[in-house]
Regions:
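Short internal beta-strands
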Residues: 54-58, 62-67, 111-113, 138
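Intrinsically disordered, low-complexity, positively charged segments
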Residues: 4-46
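Hydrophobic or amphipathic alpha-helical targeting/insertion segments
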Residues: 100-153
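Compact, glycine/acidic-enriched structural inserts
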Residues: 68-102
Length: 168
């Protein structure tokens, strides 16, 4: 599937689940800096492969927020996808939460996979929804419903290393 086809499938799923705005971060269950293949949902839905960024999908728009390290890469990878690049920190570019607050209407539902957002982010989203008398659905991984060949969760053993130096 192309990115526009994935977005179309996601929007259909959003409609079926009564989700009006859906947030797709770059994160895993442990808030790791670099995520395994299973957790590259934002890459799957936007086509952007950088290690940092968050997508916000509405019924009619798809936007990706990323920082200056990735402006050139993101612009190239988003070309032709209908995903709009939001260059964080640049003049005239709204902060992501301000955009969510703008597009989320009263009585609508903001959705995200609560397993991959921090408590702080979840609280921010709940506060935005509260201002709009909107609902929050944090128990929905819509990407999993449309990503047919999604890599399975890693079952590798965890290895605990000894500290490299000890402090007296």
């Amino acid at each position: 599937m192309t990115v526009p086809e994935r977005l179309s499938a996601l929007r259909k799923c959003m409609e079926e689940k009564n989700i009006d705005v859906y947030v797709v971060p770059t994160a895993d269950f442990h808030q790791s800096e670099y995520v395994g293949e299973h957790f590259k949902a934002r890459k799957f839905i936007t086509g952007f492969s950088g290690s940092a960024g968050t997508a916000v999908i509405t019924k009619t728009e798809a936007r990706l927020w990323t920082d200056g390290r990735y402006f050139i890469q993101a612009a190239a990878q988003l070309e032709g996808t209908t995903v709009e690049l939001m260059k964080m920190g640049e003049p005239g570019v709204p902060e992501m939460n301000a955009y969510i607050e703008e597009v989320l209407k009263e009585g609508e539902t903001l959705g995200f996979d609560g397993r991959v957002v921090s408590v702080g982010e979840g609280e921010d989203y709940a506060a935005i929804a509260g201002k709009k008398n909107a609902k929050v659905n944090y128990q929905v991984d819509l990407i999993d419903e449309i990503w047919e060949d999604r890599p399975v969760l890693s079952l590798s053993l965890i290895h605990i290393s000894e500290p490299t130096r000890r402090v007296v």
